């Protein structure tokens, strides 16, 4: 059945690739917090209820990792993603130029058709991290993809001299990687046009591995910025951006805001590439520190979720792994963290963002810092629940609105991102 239905779906998708679909719409809220944590076991197995809805956190039904409010596809869950395993085993050809693209697209279309309902309108994230689509971005352990590409070129073009073979390896890899990522997005958007499709960790920034020197600025690495400019085709093909703002375990807390700010500013920069209106930016936030497993502190939440809201991101995606729901004890730890720390802060930020939107932007845009470097300006309610002073914020209007306070209607589809 798969082999019969898949190509038929791809054929229909191919006929629609030039339809000129408008960007999908985002729920009408200035700042969204989404739950991408596999916590379904907490209630189903251990009877521990996590009150996400009451805390203003958007989750899938039953709190499943994949669902109709948001979904993420890992490397083995959509099509035939090529990569090398830990022992060097090639999966799906190992490198993009060895992959039969039509078979990949057929399978991806089949999987999307059967996993997401036609009206799906949430974030749909592709998590493909094994290689970078640009040759120069494959350093460290990723050099295996350069070596395999050179071996491929030597086999396919045996009569060329080594320098020409290297050129074929380089161009062949980049062209095939681009076709794979671009066409996967196009197929996905044609099948589920209201979904917010994009790749996790794109754009990169390269600001997380600097030394702990006192002169840390948080600015993105120059080479990474140049690669992001080269990836203009990826931003043009995406309908949302999902940068990672996971706090580095060794980075001093005093530098957290600079780290997050520059990652988001780079996402805002490329969000305009190939689009009349900037793409929504939804940053990935990890609930626990990678090495210690500790939940993010109140200050960590301010410097990740709070900074994202203050800079004008469309929202954040909260991510966690299966360990958070691996036992009744772990589920209660998660429950207590939600109720005591995370939930109250999410309520504060989302309500403040909504209040600022209505007070300053007529409800037709989101508030963002006038000066991104104004580190003390946040969208927070006062401790007594009263509204803050939004003088440090200006309006970023939704699609269909313009003016300093988003008071002027503009023709075109309305977008509330």
UniProtKB/Swiss-Prot annotation:
Subcellular location, record wording: Secreted; Cell membrane; Cytoplasmic vesicle, Secretory vesicle, Acrosome; Endoplasmic reticulum
UniProt keyword Hydrolase present: yes
Main enzyme class: hydrolase
EC number(s) stated in the UniProt entry for this protein: 3.2.1.35
InterPro entries found in the cross-reference section: Aldolase_TIM (IPR013785), Glycoside_hydrolase_SF (IPR017853), Hyaluronidase (IPR018155), Hyaluronidase-3 (IPR027260)
Gene Ontology CC terms, in alphabetical order: acrosomal membrane; acrosomal vesicle; cytoplasmic vesicle; early endosome; endoplasmic reticulum; extracellular region; lysosome; plasma membrane
Predominant place of localization: secreted
Signal peptide per UniProt: 1-20
Induction statement: Expression is not significantly up- or down-regulated by ultraviolet irradiation B (UV-B) in epidermis.
Keywords: Cell membrane, Cytoplasmic vesicle, Disulfide bond, EGF-like domain, Endoplasmic reticulum, Endosome, Fertilization, Glycoprotein, Glycosidase, Hydrolase, Membrane, Secreted, Signal
Active-site residues, record numbering mapped to chain: 129 (proton donor)
Gene Ontology biological process terms in this record: carbohydrate metabolic process; cartilage development; cellular response to interleukin-1; cellular response to tumor necrosis factor; cellular response to UV-B; hyaluronan catabolic process; inflammatory response; negative regulation of ovarian follicle development
Annotated glycan sites: 69, 215
Tissues expressing this chain: Expressed in sperm. Highly expressed in epidermis of the skin, where it is expressed intracellularily in the deep horny layer (at protein level). Bone marrow, testis and kidney.
SS bond partners: 42-331, 205-220, 356-367, 361-395, 397-406
Domain of life: Eukaryota
PTM annotation: N-glycosylated.
Gene3D superfamilies linked: Aldolase class I
Record domain EGF-like: where: 352-407
Function noted in UniProt: Facilitates sperm penetration into the layer of cumulus cells surrounding the egg by digesting hyaluronic acid. Involved in induction of the acrosome reaction in the sperm. Involved in follicular atresia, the breakdown of immature ovarian follicles that are not selected to ovulate. Induces ovarian granulosa cell apoptosis, possibly via apoptotic signaling pathway involving CASP8 and CASP3 activation, and poly(ADP-ribose) polymerase (PARP) cleavage. Has no hyaluronidase activity in embryonic fibroblasts in vitro. Has no hyaluronidase activity in granulosa cells in vitro.
Family: Belongs to the glycosyl hydrolase 56 family.
Protein name: Hyaluronidase-3
Organism in which the protein naturally occurs: Homo sapiens
Gene (UniProt): HYAL3
